[in-house]
A protein has these predicted regions:
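Beta-propeller blade repeat segments, especially FG-GAP/WD-type strand-to-loop junctions
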Residues: 1-6, 56-77, 122-126
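Acidic/hydrophobic-patterned starts of short beta strands in beta-sheet-rich repeat architectures
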Residues: 36-48, 93-100
Length: 144
């Protein structure tokens, strides 16, 4: 669990002082607000994109709870490598987080396009993201 600070929606870190390779973590355009803990004030979830300069691009769900009027990142959950996030939603009644994404079929090469619809449901319990359910639909037709 590494702590990083985003500046202007991203974090850049060279692997070594003389290295041209760098890790870039950036805030994706997906930001959703709602009630995640039953307390006053809007909490938020955001998607972070972690590109280490290699072949992988890792997507993370970050939970920001409102504490003393300020949003604080309390937990982060890996969603997947080179997936396509379609939507993120917060259910104020259940305090649940729903993520809809396209992933690859199990056993498919990482070079294959994500085409399997997945719905992931999470709850925030004691400042941790707890996976509740993951449902998979049949592959979508990407030829249309």
């Amino acid at each position: 669990n590494e702590i990083i600070q985003l500046t202007e929606a991203e974090h850049r870190q060279a692997y070594a002082d003389d290295s041209a390779m760098e890790r870039v973590v950036r805030l994706a355009e997906i930001v959703e607000q709602g009630d995640l803990d039953g307390r006053d004030g809007k909490d938020a979830v955001v998607v972070l994109v972690d590109d280490g300069g290699g072949s992988g691009t890792f997507y993370h769900l970050a939970v920001l709870l409102r504490r003393d009027g300020t949003l604080e990142n309390v937990a982060t959950q890996l969603l997947g490598d080179r997936i396509l996030i379609q939507s993120v939603a917060i259910d104020d009644a259940s305090h649940g987080i729903t993520v809809h994404a396209l992933v690859r079929e199990e056993g498919a090469p990482m070079s294959a396009e994500p085409e399997v619809q997945v719905t992931m449901l999470y709850l925030v319990i004691d400042d941790r993201i707890s996976p509740v359910r993951r449902s998979v639909s049949s592959p979508v037709d990407t030829t249309r």
